[in-house]
């Protein structure tokens, strides 16, 4: 005898809970746990404030630096260098990556050079860049571009290579030219993989800008950390580090939102 199972209707509230992304709770919970352990470490260790400041002391220093305009000045300098370096690296990496994905012999010729370049830390190259281009914004942009370039390049090559060959052949059979192939086939299909490199590149661009500021910067969050270290202003160091983390997180989230918008636009 065949039995049928009863159909259970799921209420909209339950469906909304099922669609709820529990990882969204990760950041607030992590921050709360970090603050709890931080305060516990301050209380139990007994370290003075210039070694391990309390969260309340750092929050007060943050407001002081923000209201005085000091934090804005250094944050905008770091953000300008990071976005400038990212933009430069993105343009070069997209053009070169697309070329390497289609020209095998060129990829084989440049692959050893690109691999060897990664053995040299950017921190070691930064003094040379500053020596050649000065201690201004240009050198920081170049340092940020250097550290950002390779992840975007690799993801560009992988994204183009991952497109099924059959789709490319069908596009050519349909009479598509090179531009139409890029616009209607390669670009939409490569976006998800490509944006993985973009998000990584944005995070690394901030690191590159700070490296340049550490070496010879008079303005920027890296320079602010150097200044605070010389003054034994440990709360200000924590403020600069928290600001860097906030910048990186914001850029990462914005890149994810941009990816969703572009994917929806291409799908429509």
Curated annotation (Swiss-Prot):
It is a multi-pass membrane protein. Gene3D superfamilies: MetI-like. The keyword Transmembrane helix applies. SUPFAM superfamilies: MetI-like. InterPro entries: MetI-like, MetI-like_sf. Residues 75-255 form the ABC transmembrane type-1 domain. GO terms for cellular component: plasma membrane. Keywords: Cell membrane, Membrane, Transmembrane, Transmembrane helix, Transport. Induction: Expression is probably regulated by riboflavin, via an FMN riboswitch. CDD domains: TM_PBP2. The chain crosses the membrane at residues 24-44, 76-96, 119-139, 140-160, 185-205, 236-256. GO terms for biological process: transmembrane transport. It is found in: Cell membrane. PANTHER family: ABC TRANSPORTER PERMEASE PROTEIN HI_0355-RELATED (PTHR30151:SF20), ALKANE SULFONATE ABC TRANSPORTER-RELATED, MEMBRANE SUBUNIT (PTHR30151). Part of an ABC transporter complex that transports riboflavin into the cell. The complex is likely composed of an ATP-binding protein, a transmembrane protein (RibX) and a solute-binding protein (RibY). This is Riboflavin transport system permease protein RibX. It comes from Chloroflexus aurantiacus (strain ATCC 29366 / DSM 635 / J-10-fl).
